[in-house]
Amino acid sequence: DTKGNPNEIIVLHSQHNCYDKALEAAGAKLKIIGDADEVLLFDLEGSFDERTAAVFFCPVDHYASAALPLKTVVEIAHAHGVPVIVDAAAQLPPMENLWRYTDEGADMVVFSGGKTLHGPQASGLILGKRRYIEECRRFGAPMHGVCRSAKATKESMIGLYVAVKNFMATDWTVWNAKMD
């Protein structure tokens, strides 16, 4: 239950997609800003209030031309004391994306375990600032928070661990040659 707490998540209209439903399932209210063709600085700057919990950013290429750059979003959000969460579920490879978004200032970044990592389908990584990772842990198993019903099995955790190790050991020159 998010009543009485900040529970609005700002989403750039050009990045609004069906996966936003996961935010609503956790109790968030989405505040969609700008329009599908363009999100302007003043759209973002004027969207923060006492109910704002986070900004959700989706760095997918086909959204990029209508969105503000992540560094700009981070700068504005942090000026308001609001964290930025990046949905990078499908942003691997390149391997550098594992740290790119946090290097650009994002507070949390989520990656799918079941896409390019080739881990279990119902797994993923949450990377970012310790304080936010600890908050995530507070709501998952063995606690009885909102994420309890989506807890990862031991098998999924080990499978994801092995998948990440294999991903990190991959020779990406071969993959890049295939993509060229």
Protein language model features and the residues they cover:
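Active-site capping/gating regions of soluble enzymes
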Residues: 174-176
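Conserved PLP-enzyme active-site core in the AAT-like
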Residues: 1-168, 172
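Mixed-charge interfacial surface used for oligomerization/domain docking
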Residues: 178-180
